[in-house]
Amino acid sequence: MKIVVDENMPYVEPLFGALGEIIPVNGRTLTPEQVQDADVLLVRSVTRVNAALLDANPKLKFVGSATIGTDHVDLAYLAGRGIPFSNAPGCNATAVGEFAFIAMLELAARFNSPLKGKVVGIVGAGNTGSATAKCLEAYGIKVLLNDPIKAAEGDPRHFVSLETLLLEADIISLHVPITRSGEHKTLHLFDEARLMSLKPNIWLVNCCRGDVIDNQALIKVKKQRDDLKLVLDVWEGEPHPMPELVPFAEFATPHIAGYSLEGKARGTFMLYQKLCELLAIPANKRLSELLPPFHFKAVELEQTPDEKALLQLARFVYDLRDDDAVFRNGFARSNGFDTMRKNHKHRREFSALALAYHGQSEVDWLSNLGFSGVGR
């Protein structure tokens, strides 16, 4: 069995090596010739999976995408040909949620404006939005959820309108898929008019899709509104973000919010499980076997961490400032965006760090935030 796989997908060899011949490829430049005799195709979001790519392949048995979203895949085409498809919903949700939370802590420290006491509006309450809410609520932050689709489907959580969210939230975090038409279109959901209408001193975090914000309009608005603080992990025109926009972001990264070691391993592992199910063979591998030990054995706490100490704990796991610096130095180079993604040092999730607590105060919130081993 020939398995064509994006070269940036981790843990392919230990998971799929026994199932067939693995052919690593550049996912962004993948051609029909490279997949014409593949039995299995495993991709990420940089690959457009459609008739143009697959028409020349008569034998494809399975397409898997190690992503939450599927907007890069022509699902109707695959269904029409009877080719099974699976993605990895939720595989990197924890990573994205922690990224957004850490970004807010970093903004709070930079502007000496504590996160505690602020109201955070989350636009899009799917996997990543819910993971972000989980972190915030663990820390005691009031969260407003906006998701008209979830609300219409009967989701029991309390939702507010986008208008209410924009009026009440001090921070807005975006977690919607890109939808280019229809009642709930998200393409340029934040256009010039909406950006200009944001309340004073708002923080705007985007780690879903770059096109959800009109980037050209964002440049125009930022020139007029220095009070609007930005964290941008995604960009219109990836892998070529607008150079003029980058300096306007407090933190800028190359679409790596979901790039935790756990998240990336989880995405590949979910496709492995699905392919084994399709082939009717046992999935003998275990996710825990893939992950290396964390470089900190444990961190001992003498007292309940305040916000400054919490940020320090978060930085033990992931220091956003490092990726921001690398991005600013490299995004304008030829293939710089993709090179940074490919060479990204996979951060760990909070669960990799064990905390030993010796104080008397309540610390369940640290466990709820995701840290492991919290105990007295």
Curated annotation (Swiss-Prot):
Q: Which UniProt keywords apply?
A: Cytoplasm, NAD, Oxidoreductase, Pyridoxine biosynthesis
BP-aspect Gene Ontology terms: pyridoxine biosynthetic process
Q: Which InterPro entries match?
A: D-iso_2-hydroxyacid_DH_PdxB (IPR050418), D-isomer_2_OHA_DH_cat_dom (IPR006139), D-isomer_DH_CS (IPR029753), D-isomer_DH_NAD-bd (IPR006140), Erythronate-4-P_DHase (IPR020921), Erythronate-4-P_DHase_dimer (IPR024531), NAD(P)-bd_dom_sf (IPR036291), PdxB_dimer_sf (IPR038251)
Q: Which CDD domains match?
A: ErythrP_dh
Note the Gene3D superfamilies from the entry.
3.30.1370.170, NAD(P)-binding Rossmann-like Domain (3.40.50.720)
Give residues annotated as binding substrate. 45, 67, 259
Q: Name one Pfam family in it.
A: 2-Hacid_dh
Q: Where is the active site?
A: 209, 238, 255 (proton donor)
Record-listed NAD(+) binding positions: 147, 233, 258
Catalysed conversion reaction: 4-phospho-D-erythronate + NAD(+) = (R)-3-hydroxy-2-oxo-4-phosphooxybutanoate + NADH + H(+)
**Record function comment:** Catalyzes the oxidation of erythronate-4-phosphate to 3-hydroxy-2-oxo-4-phosphonooxybutanoate.
Q: Matching HAMAP family, A to Z?
A: PdxB (MF_01825)
Q: What is this protein called?
A: Erythronate-4-phosphate dehydrogenase
Organism in which the protein naturally occurs: Shewanella sp. (strain MR-7)
Name of the gene:
pdxB
